[in-house]
């Protein structure tokens, strides 16, 4: 009988992947980022092991939206006090803090567990073209 060996956390080889978000559709980029963070693009993907790569997103403020989602979609947060449900539109988040917008959207596509929080820490988002990870990102 043959057995499939699943990979261990210490055997995973992690790469740094650079994604330029300039003039690309927001939802398609987020889907690609979530797939890379989970490690589903690798042949040795194992659901219970974090085998994803690091992702660096540049030009996050120049992303496009396919429809009028900028004005319609909202992100909600609650402070814990009565009547303090805060809402922000996607357009406001994109103008003020595009890094937060990318992290919130990606978090919705990752598992809601300790493993998902660990995966989200490997996402680095920058509004401009400059980023401090040029030494890690190779060849992209």
Curated annotation (Swiss-Prot):
Assembly and interaction partners: Part of the 50S ribosomal subunit.
List, in alphabetical order, the GO biological process terms annotated in this UniProt record: negative regulation of translation; translation
Q: Does the keyword Acyltransferase apply?
A: no
Which Pfam families does the record match to this protein? Ribosomal_L13
- One GO molecular-function annotation for this sequence? structural constituent of ribosome
GO cellular component terms, semicolon-separated: cytosolic large ribosomal subunit
Give the protein's recorded name. Answer: Large ribosomal subunit protein uL13
Top-rank taxon: Bacteria
Say which family it is in.
Answer: Belongs to the universal ribosomal protein uL13 family.
Summarizing the function annotation, the protein's role is:
This protein is one of the early assembly proteins of the 50S ribosomal subunit, although it is not seen to bind rRNA by itself. It is important during the early stages of 50S assembly.
Q: Which organism is it from?
A: Nautilia profundicola (strain ATCC BAA-1463 / DSM 18972 / AmH)
Which keywords fit this entry according to its UniProt record? Ribonucleoprotein, Ribosomal protein
């Amino acid at each position: 009988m043959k057995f499939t060996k699943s990979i261990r956390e210490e055997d995973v080889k992690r790469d740094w992947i650079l994604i330029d978000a300039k003039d690309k559709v927001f939802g398609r980029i987020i889907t690609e980022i979530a797939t890379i963070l989970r490690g589903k693009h690798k042949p040795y993907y194992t659901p219970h092991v974090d085998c994803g790569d690091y992702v660096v997103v540049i030009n996050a403020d120049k992303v496009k939206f396919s429809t009028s989602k900028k004005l319609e979609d909202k992100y909600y947060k609650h402070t814990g006090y009565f009547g303090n449900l805060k809402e922000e539109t996607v357009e406001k988040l994109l103008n003020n803090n595009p890094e937060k917008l990318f992290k919130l959207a990606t978090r919705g596509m990752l598992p809601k567990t300790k493993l998902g929080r660990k995966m989200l820490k490997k996402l680095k988002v920058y509004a401009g073209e400059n980023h401090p990870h040029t030494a890690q990102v190779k060849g992209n």
